[in-house]
């Protein structure tokens, strides 16, 4: 605002004269090091006073070349790369990649391994939504829910550590099953968590849904109509908050999801409030799925017995030279899927996560393309922010729940 404009119109001028007060359009650089961007995201924001006229996202600060790297590693070696894209819901990438390679190979995953995958995937979804809830409300100035959300998340990470040995980047899912069976203490501890988690989720919803302050900050802010959401390619909670009933677990079931009973929560207005509410209600559905999975967790193998896919058991290495040779070739050369191409979509915490893999018959994929939901969902940010206020832009970013490792890859 220029000083000469202020001199022309006195401070005690009547409203009709004050309307003539002019402002300058300003460009504001937000990020890439800024807590509200949830990672290394840079936004070029054009403002007229406090009103957002335009937002241009600049990405690529976390680009690590995952797709090209995976084309120069064996199918088995790539398992260590996949969880590092979406580090908050890493089981989703592990599972999607494994399903795509298994489709190429025609592998058969044992029922117990499928059930274990579902349990861990839904637990990982819960942990991701807890981060979304805690940090999203923290961006709006609510500090207490952050500690509540991370309290339950720590319990989930402890469960992961028991099963996989890692709190992050688990590398537990294998082509044709999982690395090993669940430890004995896992199921009893998981049941303890499932006893208290539904009540805690009710508390989370009450904390923000019944808060008049949050209601004013979130209701009607960053509205994305259903037709716009579809045109922009939104998926996951951001799409369902606009009232579009699309969940990959229902539309294209995998890992036996068609045999589980769960609902798909939908929003009504497609605003920040609905995007928060839908994800909290999704947490209840994840609890339902895990409880059903525990009931059908029967004893059995956890790897495809096909020797072309699964290495020989460790105890055979002490008595069989053939087992030693095959074990060596399995981990150095890997297996050779037939020529072909596949695309397998899955439902991650952020939306449709898909792996497109092309095989030329070698031990390494010829082409890997990852359909990352965070990358696609971020395209809606300019539309959702236009006409809103600067503080509301922070809430809109949080409600889209982007993970920059998923965006840049």
From Swiss-Prot:
<protein>
    <recommendedName>
        <fullName>NADH-quinone oxidoreductase subunit 4</fullName>
        <ecNumber>7.1.1.-</ecNumber>
    </recommendedName>
</protein>
<keyword id="KW-0874">Quinone</keyword>
<dbReference type="GO" id="GO:0050136">
    <property type="term" value="F:NADH:ubiquinone reductase (non-electrogenic) activity"/>
</dbReference>
<dbReference type="GO" id="GO:0051287">
    <property type="term" value="F:NAD binding"/>
</dbReference>
<comment type="function">
    <text>NDH-1 shuttles electrons from NADH, via FMN and iron-sulfur (Fe-S) centers, to quinones in the respiratory chain. The immediate electron acceptor for the enzyme in this species is menaquinone. Couples the redox reaction to proton translocation (for every two electrons transferred, four hydrogen ions are translocated across the cytoplasmic membrane), and thus conserves the redox energy in a proton gradient required for the synthesis of ATP. The Nqo4 subunit may contain the quinone-binding site.</text>
</comment>
<dbReference type="InterPro" id="IPR029014">
    <property type="entry name" value="NiFe-Hase_large"/>
</dbReference>
<dbReference type="GO" id="GO:0005886">
    <property type="term" value="C:plasma membrane"/>
</dbReference>
<keyword id="KW-0520">NAD</keyword>
<dbReference type="InterPro" id="IPR014029">
    <property type="entry name" value="NADH_UbQ_OxRdtase_49kDa_CS"/>
</dbReference>
<comment type="subunit">
    <text>NDH-1 is composed of 15 different subunits, Nqo1 to Nqo15. The complex has a L-shaped structure, with the hydrophobic arm (subunits Nqo7, Nqo8 and Nqo10 to Nqo14) embedded in the membrane and the hydrophilic peripheral arm (subunits Nqo1 to Nqo6, Nqo9 and Nqo15) protruding into the bacterial cytoplasm. The hydrophilic domain contains all the redox centers. This subunit interacts extensively with Nqo6.</text>
</comment>
<keyword id="KW-1278">Translocase</keyword>
<dbReference type="InterPro" id="IPR001135">
    <property type="entry name" value="NADH_Q_OxRdtase_suD"/>
</dbReference>
<dbReference type="Pfam" id="PF00346">
    <property type="entry name" value="Complex1_49kDa"/>
</dbReference>
<dbReference type="GO" id="GO:0048038">
    <property type="term" value="F:quinone binding"/>
</dbReference>
<comment type="similarity">
    <text>Belongs to the complex I 49 kDa subunit family.</text>
</comment>
<dbReference type="InterPro" id="IPR022885">
    <property type="entry name" value="NDH1_su_D/H"/>
</dbReference>
<keyword id="KW-1003">Cell membrane</keyword>
<keyword id="KW-0813">Transport</keyword>
<keyword id="KW-0472">Membrane</keyword>
